[in-house]
């Protein structure tokens, strides 16, 4: 397999979609590792496996409709494998195997079905102290945006997934790219007060547009960096409540086609009427209760150079 992913929106040819089967029991509050799951367990609204399966089936059907080759990881018993993005990610023709949080290490073995098709020298394992998850890595052609957390309480912050060591390592293995760090606000138990991954506060769509939640960044200058790059006229800003429901976490099949949650009325209408995009609406509300949405569920392997 010849990997090729340079951005978030070029025409998708091959992707890994997470696995909804055998997710195991509902975690306790202590076992949750993101604020949205914490809230779902606290309020007894954590999703049922059959609902997760149904929603992912709808997403898969849209991918297949557009001729995308869909890979699935092996099913591991009693293991939540919905969010493929965090296990690995592709930059150009390289796949980086994430050093994910210890609670999720078992998930990586299920991706052998993909790794076995990739040349060994294109698979990169990070040094032990370099932590990164794919949700914090957003591609925009020659630019790689990386969501970071560099504060002293990093070891205590369950929702801090990517550190400065990973940022340095990625720069080393992709020397032709421009890397831009964006520091995120974090909170372990309040999903309205912190950002789990960069793709929960920022996402490029189309050729030159972006969806942004400005208050997700620890430093206001990071928001202005994005605004300067894309242009205010090309940015759709979401509210705190829309961020909570993960409006930035849409997934592009091409520069013209984006998959979005069906309840994102304001965003979906804007993308269609103002940006002229085709919006494929799917139900994904139950999955969102576990702290991720559409982009989180995918690991793109091949996109065209369009």
Please identify what each model-predicted range represents.
Residues 1-306:
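The feature marks the mature, well-folded catalytic cores of soluble enzymes
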